UniProtKB/Swiss-Prot annotation:
Disulfide-bonded cysteines: none
Entry-linked InterPro entries: NICE-1 (IPR031698)
Ranges of Low complexity composition bias in the record: 83-99
Protein name, per record: Cysteine-rich C-terminal protein 1
Region of interest (Disordered), ranges: 1-42, 65-99
Compositional bias per record (Pro residues), positions renumbered to this chain: 22-32
Amino acid sequence: MSSQQSAVSAKGFSKGSSQGPAPCPAPAPTPAPASSSSCCGSGRGCCGDSGCCGSSSTSCCCFPRRRRRQRSSGCCCCGGGSQRSQRSNNRSSGCCSGC
């Protein structure tokens, strides 16, 4: 009986090892260009660009530059940098909610 149990356990072990759930493959880190990694939204400019505040290491949200006489483009920086251009439109959009 012991030989039968050992055969069953050996069979179960080999079956489990060969047909076990495969671990999820780790995502390969793809180096993104600086322009895409530091951008704050689609088509809203990038941190550090002219008219935007902050840098790639600073969470920020950039808005399109208006045609009015504004030195900034309506950008809000969080953490590390000073919060700038906190106007009503920026606050209403929820951009500065985490500041």
